[in-house]
From Swiss-Prot:
Record flagged with keyword Ribosomal protein: yes
Gene: rpsQ
The protein, known as: Small ribosomal subunit protein uS17
HAMAP family assigned: Ribosomal_uS17_B
GO biological process, one term: translation
SUPFAM superfamilies, per the entry: Nucleic acid-binding proteins
Organism: Bacillus cytotoxicus (strain DSM 22905 / CIP 110041 / 391-98 / NVH 391-98)
Length: 87
């Protein structure tokens, strides 16, 4: 059980849900420059497994690291933190 707590958990925004049972999540983080101290924002996209196809574009979701599910999928959807507002 303690092994599960060591898996990486990220929170990000869904940017694509066009694939079946797969979402693309954009995770934005900040790093501080070692010399100047300025915070630099950078982002990375992860593909995550969404078994029920419940996440939509714009949702804020939490994803967790898991075993390789395909050539590019290494994460699975844990929960939808905030649903997107549809105008």
């Amino acid at each position: 059980m303690s092994e599960r707590n060591q898996r990486k958990v990220y929170t990000g925004r869904v940017v694509s849900d066009k694939m079946d049972k797969t979402i693309t999540v954009l995770v934005e983080t900040y790093k501080t420059h070692s010399l100047y101290g300025k915070r630099v924002k950078y982002s990375k996209k992860y593909k995550a497994h969404d078994e029920q196809n419940q996440a939509k574009v714009g949702d804020i979701v939490k994803i967790m690291e898991t075993r390789p599910l395909s050539a590019t999928k290494r994460f699975r959807l844990v929960e939808i933190v905030e649903e997107a507002v549809i105008i």
